[in-house]
């Protein structure tokens, strides 16, 4: 991947490619664009010599698939899956060079990711929910597709709540619905959900679909025998689960 660096025009930028701290005395001075292989961690600092001002260090990882993130590094448990899902344009970063792996996501964001994974098929019609007028144009087609295909459902009061945060249980259920839409048979999967100590916290209407996601290895526990079904799903968890789901197709 071709990399360019920038800093204070009055000074110089120094960088390393081995993960060590860059300093003016023993590391490379940036003179122009350079190429690095995937998996390289670039650490850079800008130094203005005449007054000794030194910028905060910047650290970026060039992933194996050519993504450039400051908060996704080799060794992170989600590294390969985030790299894959971002490279395929399914779940993009939240800002330039930022993925925000520990941030949650909304129902609209998840619908958009799954819609992209499906190839963004053409849709027609209107969202028939009490809060449909509040749906932004950026996610309208994705939500329409998700609702028409039974992947996302509204609430008993007639609202869709696209801005509501996704729980781990909801995420697992939607992964299962996506697989069923793609032709996956989930009728004879073993019961693994009951093996989690907090399985009783799962809404009865979600148990079959969430169990399928667990039995297929899409949703896994968080440690200590717990599933944390009602905990908020993070962007990293979502990328990992989508990647696992796609492997089942």
Model feature map: region roles:
Residues 1-10, 77-88:
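Extracellular/luminal Pro/Thr/Ser-rich low-complexity repeat and linker "mucin-like" segments
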Residues 45-51, 151, 218, 243:
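Charged, amphipathic alpha-helical interaction segments
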Residues 234-241:
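C-terminal/domain-terminus segments
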Residues 9, 17-19, 114, 118, ...:
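Short, small-residue-rich loop/turn micro-motifs
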Residues 61-79, 87, 92-111, 115-141, ...:
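Feature responds to low-complexity, polar/acidic, surface-exposed segments characteristic
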Residues 1-66:
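Short, compositionally stereotyped local motifs that mark structural "simplifiers"
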């Amino acid at each position: 991947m071709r990399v360019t660096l920038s800093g204070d025009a009055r000074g110089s930028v120094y960088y390393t490619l081995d993960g060590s701290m860059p300093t003016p005395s023993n590391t490379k001075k940036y003179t122009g664009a350079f190429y690095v292989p995937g998996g390289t961690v670039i650490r850079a600092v800008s130094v203005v010599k005449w007054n000794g001002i030194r910028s905060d260090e910047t650290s970026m990882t060039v992933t194996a698939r050519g993504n450039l993130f400051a908060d996704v590094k080799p060794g992170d448990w989600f590294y390969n899956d985030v790299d894959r899902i971002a490279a395929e344009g399914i779940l993009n970063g939240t800002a330039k060079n930022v993925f925000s792996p520990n941030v949650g996501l909304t129902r609209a964001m998840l619908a958009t990711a799954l819609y992209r994974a499906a190839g963004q098929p053409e849709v027609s019609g209107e969202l028939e929910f009490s809060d449909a007028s509040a749906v932004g144009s950026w996610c309208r087609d994705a939500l329409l597709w998700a609702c028409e295909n039974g992947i996302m459902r509204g609430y008993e009061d007639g609202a869709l709540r696209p801005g509501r945060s996704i729980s781990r249980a909801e995420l697992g259920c939607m992964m299962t619905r996506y697989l069923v839409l793609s032709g996956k048979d989930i009728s004879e999967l073993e019961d693994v959900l009951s093996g989690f100590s907090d399985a009783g916290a799962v809404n009865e209407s979600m148990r079959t679909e969430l169990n399928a996601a667990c039995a297929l290895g899409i949703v896994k526990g968080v440690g200590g025998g717990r599933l944390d079904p009602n905990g908020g799903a993070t962007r990293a968890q979502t990328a990992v689960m989508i990647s696992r789901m796609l492997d089942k197709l």
